A protein has these predicted regions:
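Expand to "…catalyze enediolate/carbanion chemistry for C-C bond making/breaking, isomerization
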Residues: 1-104
Length: 104
């Protein structure tokens, strides 16, 4: 059995400005919880599914760049689901690396 976390789809919502978006903090909280549960149970986290791009988009709010709802229209490029931008993706990757380094 492989345990996979998909922190993107369950955290999609329509923003006040009408854009389909995700809050980076919600994604991080779900990923962190996924690893904490597995660490507590002594099981192996198999992976995470993340929608991302290397582009400088503004499709998900939050992160170190502090993207706000009012910023979404600046570089909202997706034709389907909102993706983490390059900075948010790196933030998440470093968080996952930190959590993996704690695994027994």
């Amino acid at each position: 059995m492989t345990w996979i976390c998909d922190p993107m789809h369950g955290n999609t919502f329509e923003s006040a400005s009408g854009y389909k978006t995700r809050d980076f903090d919600d994604v991080v909280d779900e990923v962190r919880g996924f690893f904490e549960v597995h660490q507590g149970l002594g099981t192996v986290p198999g992976g995470i599914h993340v929608e991302l791009t290397g582009n400088d988009v503004t499709e998900c709010i939050g992160g170190a760049e502090k993207i706000l709802d009012a910023d979404l229209n600046k570089r909202y490029e997706t034709v389907c689901d909102p993706r983490l931008n390059h900075q948010q993706s790196l933030e998440l990757a470093f968080l996952v690396a930190e959590m993996l380094s704690r695994e027994p």
